[in-house]
Amino acid sequence: MRCGSLCRFLWLWSCLSYIEAVPIQRVQDDTKTLIKTIITRINDISPPQGVCSRPRVAGLDFIPRVQSVRTLSGMDQILATYQQILTSLQSRSVVQIANDLANLRALLRLLASAKSCPVPRARGSDTIKGLGNVLRASVHSAEVVALSRLKAALQDMLRQLDRNPGC
């Protein structure tokens, strides 16, 4: 009886010994590739006719300005805000980008856990309050501003990932 248990344990051990963890470098490379894909998608979306990429529309302060984020949790927070904004836009052209942001956030969490960082938790953004009123007034301008600022933030994140960001 004990020999049977020992044999099952050894068989299970041999199976588990072949399972390898995903190398952290591969996750980081996948993260960079997804960022580049999102930037390409943003470039493929042309702004609507007559909308400047830097409009002077009041009320778009809820869209984060470009700032260098040096931590994985900071990157996750920025992406959570943009994901919420893009989802609120209800535009067919940004649905895939919003989904890509969710996948990118999952990859950043995986990077954070591989570095033994606490899991980044996106806080509820108070800056998104009243988003519906602004979007009703200037949905196209909000989309253009959000995408241009998201693109700049993603380019900064790409640079930061090369520098091995902290928690």
Curated annotation (Swiss-Prot):
GO terms for biological process: activation of protein kinase C activity; bone growth; cellular response to leptin stimulus; energy reserve metabolic process; intestinal absorption; leptin-mediated signaling pathway; lipid metabolic process; negative regulation of appetite by leptin-mediated signaling pathway. The keyword Signal applies. Disulfide bonds join 117-167. GO terms for molecular function: hormone activity; peptide hormone receptor binding. The keyword Acyltransferase does not apply. Residues 1-21 form the signal peptide. It is found in: Secreted. Keywords: Disulfide bond, Obesity, Secreted, Signal. Coiled coil: none annotated. One of its GO terms (cellular component) is extracellular space. Its main location: secreted. Key player in the regulation of energy balance and body weight control. Once released into the circulation, has central and peripheral effects by binding LEPR, found in many tissues, which results in the activation of several major signaling pathways. In the hypothalamus, acts as an appetite-regulating factor that induces a decrease in food intake and an increase in energy consumption by inducing anorexinogenic factors and suppressing orexigenic neuropeptides, also regulates bone mass and secretion of hypothalamo-pituitary-adrenal hormones. This is Leptin. The lineage of its organism: Eukaryota, Metazoa, Chordata, Craniata, Vertebrata.
